[in-house]
Swiss-Prot record:
The keyword Amino-acid biosynthesis applies. The keyword Zinc applies. It comes from the Bacteria. It is an enzyme of class 4 (lyase). Pathway: Metabolic intermediate biosynthesis; chorismate biosynthesis; chorismate from D-erythrose 4-phosphate and phosphoenolpyruvate: step 2/7. The lineage of its organism: Bacteria, Bacillati, Cyanobacteriota, Cyanophyceae, Nostocales. NCBIfam families: aroB (TIGR01357). Its cofactor is Co(2+); Zn(2+); NAD(+). GO terms for cellular component: cytoplasm. Its EC number is 4.2.3.4. Zn(2+) binds at residues 186, 251, 268. The gene is aroB. This is 3-dehydroquinate synthase. It catalyses: 7-phospho-2-dehydro-3-deoxy-D-arabino-heptonate = 3-dehydroquinate + phosphate.
């Protein structure tokens, strides 16, 4: 069964299609968008080995001229050097303004392909075909693109909305368990910030740590409700002028932890899980949230097989210092997304270094 979610924006609206066994229909899907004939498919070697031929064959059968390029896998390759390689390939293949870059992969591939598309010829089409749970429910939707700077995550980037997002849930069967768990962090996030019903559904599942233990109807709900939540928020605030900031729940401390560990120790979702535990406890200590609800959140994070403690030996003062480089800093103050009840959050700059330190020392 195909679910279609509309992302309605003033600049460019688009569809998210969630359809099992749809990867071999990508050419047909793109043919209806009236794009130019040239396509650059960007992936990584592992993903391309599994799904590259199916995608390329489908695009070529629909009349597209397809070039493909694989970037190395991993957050540490999310750099301007990788973008330069994509520019070189775009130049070699004479990509025009009507051309399209297709991101076939997880969040790293999606972010880099989107940024390359945003900046090549001042902006060409991009289509997102996410292959990880995290990318399906989060990074492929909403137009945030970018790369990391040695001093911080996603400091270099642009907003560039995709023309289309194609989600084939069947590709998750090849996803490593650790990657699946990392994606569950973003799903839990939506339950905390926006969708209490999704949170309740997650609580009712005995296990969340592996795809094979999750009932198909719950997996459908995870994908559709998460994508709908992201579409709702982005539709109300495309460029993070206000409401969209709530999507950064757990990411403030999470990004700092990723940066301090050089993007090598933790998956993004693992860092976000740790960040949600920290933000939840800060909210409790400030009197904004009930401890019982924070405990419910933390139990879900643990049920998903995610860490809830800081990596051993991590410098807490280093985390606090890294927070000053967060994109959400305004007038020198770190803005935190904090829950007030399940499904509702607030954004505040009233969190001090002492508040943060007190919580991190207990983690």
């Amino acid at each position: 069964m195909t679910s279609v979610i509309n992302v309605n924006l003033p600049t460019q609206s688009y569809e998210i299609a969630i359809a099992p066994a749809s990867l071999d229909q990508i050419g047909q899907s793109l043919a209806g968008l009236k794009l130019g004939k040239k396509v650059l498919l960007v992936s990584n070697p592992t993903i391309f080995k599994h799904f590259g031929k199916v995608a390329v064959d489908s695009l070529e059968a629909a009349g597209f001229q397809v070039a493909s390029y694989c970037l190395p896998a991993g957050e540490r390759y999310k750099t301007l050097n990788s973008i330069q390689k994509l520019y070189d390939i775009a130049l070699e293949n004479r990509l025009e303004r009507s051309s399209t870059m297709v991101a076939l992969g997880g969040g790293v591939i999606g972010d880099m392909t989107g940024f390359a598309a945003a900046t090549w010829l001042r902006g060409i089409n991009v289509v997102q075909v996410p292959t990880t749970l995290l990318a399906m429910v989060d990074s492929a939707i909403g137009g945030k693109t970018g790369v990391n700077h040695p001093h911080g995550k996603n400091l270099i980037g642009a907003f560039h909305q995709p023309r289309f997002v194609l989600i084939d849930p069947q590709v998750l069967k090849t996803l490593p368990v650790r990657e699946f768990r990392a994606g569950m962090a973003e799903v839990i996030k939506y339950g905390v910030i926006w969708d209490a019903e999704l949170f309740n559904q997650l609580e009712q599942s005995k296990r969340l740590d592996q795809l094979r233990y999750i009932k198909p109807e719950l997996m459908d709900a995870i994908l559709t409700r998460s994508c709908q939540a992201k579409a709702d928020v982005v539709g109300k605030d495309e460029k993070e002028g206000g409401l969209r900031a709530i999507l950064n729940y757990g990411h403030t401390v999470g990004h700092a932890v990723e940066s301090l560990t050089n993007y090598r120790l933790l998956k993004h979702g693992e860092a976000v899980g740790i960040g949600m535990v920290a933000a939840g406890q800060i909210a409790v200590n400030l009197g904004l949230w009930q401890q019982a609800d924070a405990d419910r959140q933390n139990a879900l994070i643990e049920k998903a097989g995610l860490p809830t403690k800081l990596p051993a030996g991590l410098d807490i003062e280093g985390i606090i210092e890294a927070l000053q480089l967060d994109k959400k800093v305004k007038d020198g103050k770190v803005r935190f997304v904090l829950p007030t009840q399940i499904g509702v959050v607030t954004v505040t700059d009233e969190v001090t270094s002492d508040h943060i330190r007190q919580v991190l020392q207990q983690m």
